Swiss-Prot record:
Its main location: cytoplasm. Pfam families: ARD (PF03079). It comes from Danio rerio (Zebrafish). Binds either 1 Fe or Ni cation per monomer. Iron-binding promotes an acireductone dioxygenase reaction producing 2-keto-4-methylthiobutyrate, while nickel-binding promotes an acireductone dioxygenase reaction producing 3-(methylsulfanyl)propanoate. It is a peripheral membrane protein. InterPro entries: ARD (IPR004313), ARD_euk (IPR027496), RmlC-like_jellyroll (IPR014710), RmlC_Cupin_sf (IPR011051). It comes from the Eukaryota. GO terms for cellular component: cytoplasm; nucleus; plasma membrane. This is Acireductone dioxygenase.
Amino acid sequence: MSVFEAWYMDEESGEDQRLPHKLSPNQPVSVQQLEHIGVFHWKLNADIYENDPELQKIREEKGYSFMDIITIHPDKLPDYQNKLKMFYEEHLHLDDEIRYILEGSSYFDVRDEGDRWIRIAVSKGDLITLPAGIYHRFTVDESNYTKAMRLFVGEPVWKAYNRPADDFDIRKEYVNSLGSS
C-alpha cells in the first residue's frame, strides 16, 4: 500500500475488518470526491518527520500546536483488542481528526453524503485530516501495525461520540457544509 487509495466498501461482507472490503468490480473514490466531503491528504517524507519543513509548514498553517505518537500493535498498545473495537465503532469528534502515518498501514472509513462507506488506505507518509462532524472509524490492516502522529489544534481532546450523534451542532454544521460545497 504505497499509493494513497480510496474506494467504496463492500458493506455486506462480514469478513475480518482488516481486509480491504473492495466491491467487485472495484469502485474507486477520487481525491476530489474525498475533498468534497472534507477529507484532505498530503504525502510527506515520514523518515524525516522530526525535522520536516513541509510538515512544519502544514502545522503552522493549520494551527496544529500539539502532537503525540501512538503505536497500534498487539505488543505495543495496552488492551489492543478492545482498543481496536473502540476505534472501529462508528463515531464523530467535535474537532478535526489529523493523523500522520509514520510506519505501517491502516484504514480510515468515512461516510459520504449518501451515507455509504468509503475506505481510505493510508500508509507511511500519509497525512490525513477528517473534518469535525464526519462519521468515521479506523482499523489496522492485516499487518496489525501502525505508528501514527496525532495532531491537534490546542489541547488534545480524544472524546468520540458514537452514532447516532446527529443532534450535535458540529454534525449539523458538517452536513450543511456538504450542501454548500
